[in-house]
């Protein structure tokens, strides 16, 4: 049976959405049937992703594959246009993997289980759509629609301040989305051809001033989701009130949507503006790394501490994508994949700990590891992964970003040394606050009140399975990075070449107007 032309991406997107529509009519009194139904849907959709990947995806092809395009509104060339390349495919696989585990992590949810799993399956399809659509207006629509289930999950199943956190989340993201809409309309209607097709838009010759305007708009919108300082304040509040499955999706998938969009649109569609903004991204990345690491020190709430750790790690994505080197861009992509796995594992462990201790305050914990040996081992391994221990994915990703930026010929040596030194400070701070966190949770004197009022039961097989499933790719990528980089290197190398080619032309244009001009200490690379 020849399935070469089968609409894989449409099937992968619509299957969980259609399944979600069936959830309300499933006869179920205690939530057991619907949870197994949701898990089955997640597993089947993930299997479809893996099959489509192995049967139809060519690692060496940097261009869009699995392409589908169906006419929707011909007047403005609006199409149901899908495709996957090296930027999309790894994140689609990551989405299927983490969302399926998040459904399994939601086993303890007993309040309105039908509504919960309905929203989880809607998120599943919506998140994959964000990474697959190749029409800019359609991208805006799925970007917005995907926010609705996140808002509802936060506001219904969150903590005491859930409405505040959910409202702040929707205001930040919806406010940023206005910039996406304005930029999308401007790009689509510019020139003689009206089209929202991303490939068509990428081929338009936008003047530099317009590119800078569009780039700034996209940077604000996607900087909210990544997040970038100072647009980050919604994230600690959202994580502070979310449940464990929502944590896994926030850290594992939603933040990656911002990084993906920056690579796809800011780098891929506005390369000249990216060459100008690159030093700004580098500085913002360093600020993310150091500011969030220092702020994490001061947090006594476990969720907020790890939330700031996530913000710090995403700073490496900004530095990597602004490095103008193949290895740096590849490192940025790997950091997104790595953090998706590590962030999901850490926040799942927060949920496991809270289910047993019913507290998130580090001051009220202590000696937990003495009673729960499996939880002790799981916490320790996940934390070592987060601090970029050699042999784990975070180490490889951060090392690639460091090497990529340090060897970049697009910046002056002085600027490179300063940035590498400052980023290294963040790397040193990470194990300090993570190991300190472990000490307060697992070691030290036992909290007798905690033991008297709550049963400190060790991890059950379901929880061990979830963490083990996340650690397999974390360690696998750490030991053999090519298992991940082979998927996307052809695309990221093409993207890097595109922005590198923009640097010499910009420098020449500027020097023609101002002989002493130096574009943020950029110099024309040898290409």
Curated annotation (Swiss-Prot):
Catalytic activity: a plastoquinone + NADH + (n+1) H(+)(in) = a plastoquinol + NAD(+) + n H(+)(out); a plastoquinone + NADPH + (n+1) H(+)(in) = a plastoquinol + NADP(+) + n H(+)(out)
Domain of life: Bacteria
Cited InterPro entries: NADH_Q_OxRdtase_chain4 (IPR022997), NADH_Q_OxRdtase_chainM/4 (IPR010227), NADH_UbQ_OxRdtase (IPR003918), ND/Mrp_TM (IPR001750)
Subcellular location: Cellular thylakoid membrane
Principal location listed in the UniProt entry: membrane
Residue stretches spanning the membrane: 6-26, 36-56, 91-111, 113-133, 136-156, 169-189, 212-232, 243-263, 275-295, 306-326, 331-351, 387-407, 417-437
Enzyme class: translocase
Keyword Transport: no
Gene Ontology MF term list: NADH dehydrogenase (ubiquinone) activity; ubiquinone binding
Cellular compartments per GO CC: plasma membrane-derived thylakoid membrane
E.C. code: 7.1.1.-
UniProt membrane topology term: Multi-pass membrane protein
Keywords associated with the record: Membrane, NAD, NADP, Plastoquinone, Quinone, Thylakoid, Translocase, Transmembrane, Transmembrane helix
GO BP field: ATP synthesis coupled electron transport; electron transport coupled proton transport
Family of this protein: Belongs to the complex I subunit 4 family.
Known function: NDH-1 shuttles electrons from NAD(P)H, via FMN and iron-sulfur (Fe-S) centers, to quinones in the respiratory chain. The immediate electron acceptor for the enzyme in this species is believed to be plastoquinone. Couples the redox reaction to proton translocation (for every two electrons transferred, four hydrogen ions are translocated across the cytoplasmic membrane), and thus conserves the redox energy in a proton gradient.
Record-given protein name: NAD(P)H-quinone oxidoreductase chain 4 1
Native organism: Microcystis aeruginosa (strain NIES-843 / IAM M-2473)
Lineage, broadest ranks: Bacteria, Bacillati, Cyanobacteriota, Cyanophyceae, Oscillatoriophycideae
Gene from which the chain derives: ndhD1
């Amino acid at each position: 049976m020849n399935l070469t032309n089968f609409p894989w991406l449409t099937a992968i997107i619509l299957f969980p959405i259609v399944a979600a529509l069936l959830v309300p009519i499933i006869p179920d009194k205690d939530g057991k049937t619907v949870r197994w139904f949701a898990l089955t849907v997640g597993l089947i959709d993930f299997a479809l992703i893996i099959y489509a990947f192995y049967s139809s995806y060519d690692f060496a092809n940097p261009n869009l594959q699995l392409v589908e395009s169906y006419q929707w509104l011909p007047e403005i060339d609006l199409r149901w246009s899908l495709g996957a390349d090296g930027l999309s495919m790894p994140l689609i696989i990551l989405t299927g993997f983490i969302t399926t585990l998040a459904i399994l992590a939601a086993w303890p949810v007993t309040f309105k289980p039908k509504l919960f799993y309905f929203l989880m399956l809607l998120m599943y399809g919506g998140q994959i759509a964000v990474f697959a659509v190749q029409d800019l207006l359609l991208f805006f629509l799925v970007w917005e629609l995907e926010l609705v289930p996140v808002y509802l999950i936060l506001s219904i199943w969150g903590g005491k301040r859930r409405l505040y956190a959910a409202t702040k989340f929707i205001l930040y993201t919806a406010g940023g989305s206005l910039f996406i809409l304005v930029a999308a309309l401007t790009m689509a209607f510019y020139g003689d051809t009206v089209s929202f097709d991303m490939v068509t838009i990428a081929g338009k010759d936008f003047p530099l001033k317009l590119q800078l305007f569009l780039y700034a708009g996209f940077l604000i919108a996607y900087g909210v989701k990544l997040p970038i300082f100072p647009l980050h304040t919604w994230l600690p509040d959202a994580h502070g009130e979310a449940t464990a499955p929502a944590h896994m999706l926030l850290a594992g998938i939603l933040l990656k949507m911002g990084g993906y969009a920056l690579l796809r649109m800011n780098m891929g569609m506005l390369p000249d503006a990216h060459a100008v903004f690159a030093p700004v991204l580098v500085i913002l990345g360093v600020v993310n790394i150091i500011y969030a690491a220092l702020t994490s020190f001061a947090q006594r709430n476990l969720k907020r501490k790890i939330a700031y750790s996530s913000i710090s790690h995403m700073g490496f994505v900004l530095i990597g994508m602004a490095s103008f080197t193949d290895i740096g861009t590849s490192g940025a992509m790997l950091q997104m994949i790595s953090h998706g796995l590590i962030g999901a594992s850490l926040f799942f462990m927060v949920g496991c700990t809270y289910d047993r201790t019913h507290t998130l305050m580090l001051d009220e914990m202590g000696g937990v590891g003495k009673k729960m040996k499996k939880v002790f081992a799981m916490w320790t391994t996940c934390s070592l992964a987060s601090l970029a221990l050699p042999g784990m994915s975070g180490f490889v990703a951060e090392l690639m970003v460091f090497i990529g930026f340090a060897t970049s010929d697009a910046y002056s040596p002085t600027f490179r040394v300063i940035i590498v030194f400052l980023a290294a400070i963040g790397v040193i701070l990470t194990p300090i606050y993570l190991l300190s966190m472990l000490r307060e949770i697992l070691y030290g004197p036992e909290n007798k009140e905690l033991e008297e009022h709550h049963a400190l039961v060790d991890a059950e097989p379901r929880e061990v399975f979830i963490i083990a499933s996340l650690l397999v790719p974390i360690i696998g990528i750490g030991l053999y990075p090519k298992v991940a980089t082979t998927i996307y290197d052809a695309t990221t190398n093409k993207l890097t070449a595109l922005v590198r080619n923009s640097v010499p032309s910009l420098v020449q244009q500027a020097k023609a107007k101002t002989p002493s001009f130096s574009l943020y200490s950029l110099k024309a690379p040898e290409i």
